[in-house]
Amino acid sequence: QKELGKDKQMAKDAEPTFVGIRSDNELVAVNSCYYSNSKGIFNYWRSRGMWVHPNFRGQKYSSVILTWCLEYAKRKDGDWMWTVPRESALPAYKSVGFVQQSDWFEDGQYGPNCIASKYL
């Protein structure tokens, strides 16, 4: 059984939808979301790649993008959304209802990370 956040092939096979916010024609925030897998009766979606330009952080751009991704996944029959945020990004995810589901771990150059999820 593959665990959320540990299946590298899942991300390679994904067909993500990207969403961004522009200010004065400059991309200032971006994220992606995609269907990742089903387990039992639940369809899981992943949020991946949240980025907000440093000059625009702290202005709720991440909340707007995450809310859009959550609503999009729900319209596509998603039941849960999960993510592997770095420590500095977890507050943005919590602001829209994600709950930390794991301890912190090092997984590459952007850690520490954890697994967080939200029921749609």
Q: Model features per residue range: what roles?
A:
Residues S36-R48, R57, Y110-P112:
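A conserved beta-turn-beta hairpin within the catalytic core of GNAT-like acetyltransferases
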